[in-house]
Amino acid sequence: MLQQSMELIVPSLETLPQFVDALKRGWSPDNIRLEEAAREFLGMIAKDAAAFIARCTDREAKGGDVTLPDGSTVPRLPGFVRWMWDGEFCGQIGFRWQPGTEALPKHCLGHIGYAVVPWKRGNGYATKALGLMLAEARQEGLRWVELTTDPDNVASQKVITGNGGVFIERFFAEAAYGADRPELRWRISLTGPGPESQGRETGSM
């Protein structure tokens, strides 16, 4: 059953220790680079925790280039992350966009990505977090957002459809993500009734 106490919070130095603990327990907010990304985050935090927190809200894309799975780098997009919080750290959800358009660079797999820590899964937190993030995304003036999933990630697909998402296409990700990596593209409209009000009991993540 969904626990309604979960909310999205702006990352802070006060809540950072629980984020660090999750990384050390093997969780990663990056569903593709996984352990490599977790190690990078831990290194950044150890070097300058305040700077790491500041990078979590980067509407002007000043945080430096982004590293792709093959080690190549690409310019950062404007974006920000929120942490899922129910009195404890539950996971992360991020939103990125190109100002003035719904289009994304080909290397960018969707506007929104999320990851729940394993010990908080099964509470519907990803479904609720996505709905809450859609409300924030709507403020950027986009008509829709796109998300991508692996073809076999049924749980994440339910999170998306539970927030009004519709399937768009099956495609292959850029070579930087690995040869012949299939992905599914989904779209959620940000016009009309807010999808964040729909289906919050349907997701299992």
Question: Could you describe each region identified by the protein language model?
Answer:
Residues 148, 166-183:
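Conserved catalytic-core motifs of GNAT/GCN5-like acyltransferases
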Residues 113-116, 122-139, 158-162:
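Conserved acetyl-CoA-binding loop-helix of GNAT-fold acetyltransferases
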Residues 137-148:
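Conserved GNAT acetyl-CoA-binding A-motif
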Residues 147-157:
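Conserved beta-strand-loop-alpha-helix junction that forms the acyl-donor binding cleft
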Residues 16, 123, 154:
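Loop/helix-junction capping segments adjacent to catalytic residues or to phosphate/diphosphate-binding pockets
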Residues 1-111, 118, 136, 176-205:
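GNAT-family acyltransferases
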